[in-house]
Design a protein with these regions (language model features):
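Conserved ATP-binding subdomain of kinase catalytic cores across diverse folds
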Residues: 33
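Conserved small/polar residues in nucleotide/adenosyl-binding loops
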Residues: 496-500
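Gly/Thr-rich phosphate-binding beta-strand-loop-beta motif of the actin/hexokinase/Hsp70
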Residues: 2-29, 134-160, 218
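Helical "lid/coupling" subdomains associated with nucleotide-phosphate turnover
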Residues: 6, 44-72, 85-90, 95, ...
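A short interface-forming secondary-structure element
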Residues: 475-491
């Protein structure tokens, strides 16, 4: 049986993890070995704003050991990732350079949306349970040291996702100086996070019924399960979760460490983690809590298997990305019929000109998102739509997109109505590469032309046939009323093309 050996490394807020996987079409993703080294990088970053030299040296030693383990397993490929503990450190570039110099590892720093997306892919690796559960109102609560993410699913589609920077390690360090002054530490944690939690409830829950909650995080041990059935299914009742919670908050970290056989540092994080989870579960009033016990490293392996076509996933993650954009558009009252008409014409032109522009499915997805969000700025200002649209898109997290991809979508929306500056001008305030700039310019041209073809917002085009003939794009349109306005205005649009 053919299989690929893959290594996933996660540099987290309070631990560094290496997991070795065997991936095959027949057996799927199978974990072979997992090594976890405890070190609180996040403590340095969240309190000092940087990673101390001694912590950096320890990290490099651990990663060098991981490299030797990977060599022992003869891994075919690897991916190393880091999140907020590295990205928020003022000396992050130096630390990443040192890691590469001493270990040879190239570490990818994930944006929050990319990190959470991998966590969802870890859940999808257990796809039978995952797809079944999210058919009904479901919330995924993903807690780590730096923040927690709340994502709502309904009818197998992502409704919304929001990040709140109140992770277990960040909360613990923030309250460390005043913890000894109270006998009710849990009440302080509740008060600290309640404003954000209640705001989320007002904005996104309203009359929505949440039947299931999935908890992602390393805080749980088998102590959370009250019987064999729960341990087997990984699903517990809300009542039994509350029983576990009461046991946790009544014991000191030292007592927890001894009783549960875990490091003292882990025990100290169980307090804020348990309180955060309890607040969210009470707010949503869900009766069933699923604790799958998966780690992001499995999500990294899942994504690798998808990219290498070793596995075909059962859940449509691209649809989740599009649903996130659709719901942002809904929140900012976009003209949905106009957007749907624009999407039809823009995608037809993109597909017809593939041989000319050479872009792939990922760029097509970015085009769809730009179309969905190109007019969100009207919610703030009709006279400054371009800048308003850009700011709204950049301020909203879109699960599954990297920061640079979100910026590309925002720029396409902005320059749909404004003049696109030269690359030399744009790069002064943007992190786009020259290649990404060309992608933005080409997709912007498509959106401009498609937008001009529905300038009246009356959806006159009923169907479109786009054909590329000798570097000329020919559009055959079926319209249901006079098209003079659109014909005149589309003459002003220039379609950028790449050189042959």
């Amino acid at each position: 049986m053919q299989y690929s050996t893959f290594a996933a490394i996660d540099i987290g807020s309070y631990d560094v993890i290496l997991e070795i996987f065997e991936i095959s079409k027949k057996r799927g993703i199978r974990s072979v070995d997992k090594i976890c080294h405890r070190m609180e990088l996040g403590k340095d970053t969240y309190t000092l704003g940087k990673i101390r030299p001694e912590m950096e040296e320890e990290l490099c030693r651990v990663l060098a050991d991981f490299v030797r383990i990977m060599e022992g397993y003869r891994v075919d490929d690897y991916r190393a990732t880091a999140s907020s503990a590295i990205s928020e450190a003022s000396n992050s570039l130096y630390v990443l350079g040192k890691i590469h110099q001493l270990t040879g590892l190239s570490v990818t720093v994930l944006s929050n949306s990319e990190q959470r997306f991998l966590s969802y892919k870890a859940l999808a690796a257990m796809e039978d349970n995952f797809n079944k559960i999210i058919e009904k109102g479901t919330a995924i609560l993903d807690l780590d040291g730096g923040s927690f993410q709340i994502s709502l699913f309904d009818k197998d589609a992502l409704v919304t996702t929001q990040n709140i920077r109140m992770g277990s390690l960040r909360v613990r360090e923030r309250l460390a100086g005043i913890q000894s002054e109270t006998e009710h530490y849990e009440e302080m944690v509740e008060e600290l996070i309640w404003n954000e939690v209640s705001s989320f409830k007002k904005m996104y829950l309203k009359d929505r019924k949440i039947e299931n909650i999935m908890l992602i995080g390393d805080v749980f041990t088998d102590s959370v399960y009250q019987n064999i059935e729960e341990k087997t299914t990984k699903i517990i009742s809300r009542e039994n979760f509350n029983t576990w919670y009461e046991k946790i908050i009544r014991q000191s970290p030292m007592e927890l460490a001894v009783k549960l056989g875990i490091p003292l540092e882990n025990a100290s994080l169980m307090y804020p983690s348990a309180v955060i989870y309890k607040c969210l579960i009470d707010m949503m009033e869900a009766e069933h809590v699923w604790i799958p016990g998966v780690h992001m490293t499995r999500g990294i392996a899942y994504e690798y298997a998808e990219q290498m076509k070793l596995l075909k996933g059962g859940h449509n993650f691209e649809n989740d990305i599009l649903m996130a954009a659709k719901n942002i558009g809904k929140r900012y009252a976009v003209n949905r019929p106009h957007v749907q008409n624009l999407e039809m014409t823009a995608l037809a032109m993109f597909d017809a000109t593939k041989k000319m522009h050479g872009m792939k499915e990922r760029e097509r997805l970015l085009l769809q998102m730009a179309v969905m969000l190109h007019d969100v700025g009207k919610y703030i200002s009709f006279n400054n739509v371009a800048d308003s649209s850009y700011n709204i898109i950049m301020s909203n997290e879109i699960i599954g997109l990297s920061h640079i991809e979100r910026e590309m979508v925002a720029l396409i929306a902005k320059y749909n109505t404004a003049v696109l500056p030269s690359y030399d001008e744009l790069v002064m305030e943007s992190s786009l590469s020259a290649e990404q700039y060309l992608t933005v310019s080409e997709l912007t041209a498509i959106v401009r032309l498609a937008n001009a073809l529905d300038r009246s917002h009356l959806q006159k085009i009923q169907s479109i046939r786009a054909v590329l003939k000798e570097r000329e794009l020919h559009l055959s349109l079926t319209v249901d009323r006079d098209f003079t306005l659109e014909q005149g205005l589309c003459q002003d649009c220039l379609l950028y093309t790449s050189p042959s």
